[in-house]
Amino acid sequence: MLRLSAALLLAIAAPAAAMAEPSPYPALAALEARVATIGYRLTTGNAPWCARVQPQFGWLWGDPRLYSDAQRPAAEAAYGAADTDTPFLAAVAAGSPAAVAGLHAGSLVQGLAGSLPPQGEGSDPYARIAALERLFAGLPSDRPTMLDTGKAPVRIAPVVGCATDFRVDARDRPDGAADGRLVVISAGLAQFAKDDAELAAAIAHELAHNILGHRARLDAAGVDRGLLQQFGRNARLFKQTEIEADRLSPWLMANAGYDPRAAVRFWTAFGQRAGRPLLQAGTHPRWQDRAASIEKEVRAIEAQRAAGQPLAPPLIGAPPPLE
C-alpha cells in the first residue's frame, strides 16, 4: 500500500449541511491518539534497525486550515484546540517526550522558539503540517528543543526513532500509504483492527515500506505508477515490496512490544472483508498467502526468542534486489 492519496480530506471536507449529523471528530481524534502511541512505539523501538532516523516527539499534528469555517468549531472542540489560526497537536503518545513535557491534544505549537513559524507552500491544506514535520525531523535527536507555544517556551527532549511521521486519513475507504518519510492510515483500514496490536500490524506494514526504502527502490527500478502498474514487471515489483513489508512487519511489532501474531489476525480479517474486490490486484499477494508469509516470520521470531537470541529479521541490512 505505497500510494499516497491525493485527497486525504474527502471524509472530513463534507458540506456544511452534513454537520447536522453527529460530529465525526471525536472518533477521529481517538483514532489519532491510538496511531500516535503505536507509531511512537514502533519507530523508537526499532530505531537500531533503521538506516534513516529522526527525532521522535510522540505527536500527530492538527491544523485549523484543514477545516471549513462551518467545520472548525466542532473540530477544535474535539481536539481541545483554541480558535486561532495556529497548528496544534492532534494527539500525543502516552509516555512520549511530548507527554513528559506536559503537552497534550489541543496544545498549540507554532514551531521553534525564537524562529518564524513555517507556513508551507501552495494551497494544500496540509502544507503547514508538512512544513512542521520536515522542520522537526531535521533537528538533532540528542539535544532538547525549545517549542514556541505562543506562551512560555516549552523544553522537550526527543528520542531517536525511524525516520517517519504519521497521519490519519478520515475516509472510510480501507487504505494505507507510505512515501518514504510519511505513513498514512485511513479510518476505513483501522476499523478491521479489533485492538491496538492489530492496528499496529497495519501501521507496521506501512512503516516497513519506509524502512526498506521501497519508494526509492521502485523509482530506481523505473516502475510505472499509472494504469500500467497492474501489469507485467511493474505489478511483479510492487508485489515484491508488499511481500517484503508483510515479512518485516511482525518483527517490528515484536520489537515494539506487540504480539506479532496479531498481524495474521488483522490481514485475515481484512482479506475476508465484505465487499472486497472479486479480482485480486496484481500488485498484492492473496490474503491467504500474506497470512502464511507472516505466520512463517512469527515462527522465526518465536524460535529466536526461545533460543535466547536477539531478534534479527532477515530483511534488515540485506533486502533482496528488485528484479
Give, region by region, the residue ranges found by the protein language model.
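A Zn2+-metalloprotease active-site environment signal
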Residues: 19-323
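Bacterial N-terminal signal peptides
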Residues: 5-15
